[in-house]
């Protein structure tokens, strides 16, 4: 990984009614990282989201939770990235991932959107650049594509939520490893983790 990550984004829908839904898993990572570093996220209207700044291994990391709806996330990401001159390949987007089970998380660079509206808008607003990193947080799949919308906007049962929370905690630890020691070390640790 030649470039350090300069912006971590947690995809989410705004408002208390969505806070604990599976679709907001990406935001949980940003919230947990901010909590550990005692950073209060502030509402920044010009960036259409909640933002903060923290130092990991003396590297500056900006964090963002868009307060647009999910399908407009790219507007917030592009606004902040353009303002601070952050390149797509210096951005990590944390998002819920249907193709991984709850309790599993993976890092990835580049690729498509896999039907995820937040990723779709991010790619579009970054000028069709797909080279940003992703932190894919497994939420499992409801089994049929017609059930996906209700599933991602639903809340996980308690046991499943425990797995999601454990994966968020491990992801935060691995993000710090990534900032200090690079992607390979962080991947090696995160990709062997599975909360039961």
Curated annotation (Swiss-Prot):
Pfam families (alphabetical): Pept_tRNA_hydro
GO BP: protein quality control for misfolded or incompletely synthesized proteins; rescue of stalled ribosome
InterPro entries found in the cross-reference section: Pept_tRNA_hydro, Pept_tRNA_hydro_CS, Pept_tRNA_hydro_sf
Catalysis: reaction(s): an N-acyl-L-alpha-aminoacyl-tRNA + H2O = an N-acyl-L-amino acid + a tRNA + H(+)
Positions that bind tRNA: 18, 69, 71, 117
Site (Discriminates between blocked and unblocked aminoacyl-tRNA): 13
Keyword Nucleus: no
Protein keywords: Cytoplasm, Hydrolase, RNA-binding, tRNA-binding
PROSITE patterns given in the database record: PEPT_TRNA_HYDROL_1, PEPT_TRNA_HYDROL_2
Database matches in Gene3D superfamilies: Peptidyl-tRNA hydrolase (3.40.50.1470)
Matching CDD domains: PTH
Root EC class: hydrolase
Name of the protein: Peptidyl-tRNA hydrolase
Gene name of this polypeptide: pth
């Amino acid at each position: 990984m030649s470039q350090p990550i300069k912006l971590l984004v947690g995809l989410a829908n705004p408002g208390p009614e969505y806070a604990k839904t599976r679709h907001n898993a990406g935001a949980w990572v940003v919230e947990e990282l901010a909590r550990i570093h005692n950073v209060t996220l502030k509402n920044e209207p010009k960036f259409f989201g909640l933002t903060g700044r923290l130092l990991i291994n003396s590297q500056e990391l900006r964090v963002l939770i868009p307060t647009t709806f999910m399908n407009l996330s790219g507007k917030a990401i592009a606004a902040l990235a353009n303002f601070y001159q952050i390149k797509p390949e210096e951005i990590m987007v944390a998002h819920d991932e249907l193709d991984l089970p709850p309790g599993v998380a993976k890092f990835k660079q580049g690729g498509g959107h896999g039907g995820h509206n937040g990723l779709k808008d991010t790619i579009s607003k970054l000028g069709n650049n797909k080279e940003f990193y992703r932190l894919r947080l497994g939420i499992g799949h409801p089994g049929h594509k017609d059930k996906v919308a209700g599933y991602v906007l639903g809340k996980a049962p308690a046991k499943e939520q425990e797995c999601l929370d454990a994966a968020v905690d491990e992801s935060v630890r691995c993000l710090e490893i990534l900032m200090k020691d690079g992607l390979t070390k962080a991947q090696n640790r995160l990709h062997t983790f599975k909360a039961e």
